[in-house]
């Protein structure tokens, strides 16, 4: 699909990463690490595809109600319904956002904590 978008000089790609991509998380390092890799790949694609007018949006959601989160046995703040999440993602992709972090509470609160909190705080609250 990318060669077609490049030849058309237009396209939009959405790739699902996660809020967890902003820090290696204890007991979830494979998940957070793989999601960080996804976000970094998107950055490379953004640069490579910009001249072809193909945008790439790295979508970094918080918790979304799904089969995966149904099995979680911990508190999931700002848990979002799938339809609401899908509509937010569509809107971000249409606006050609490079990185879309949602819900807004996670963007404002969780990201600074994940990026800058000392390890002992992250370890204290990790599962």
Predicted feature residues:
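Active-site helix of classical SDR
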Residues: 34
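Hydrophobic structural elements of the Rossmann-like NAD(P)H-binding subdomain
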Residues: 14, 56-59, 69, 89
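Active-site loop immediately N-terminal to the catalytic Tyr-X3-Lys motif
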Residues: 25-29
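Residue(s) in the substrate-gating loop at a strand-loop-helix junction
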Residues: 18
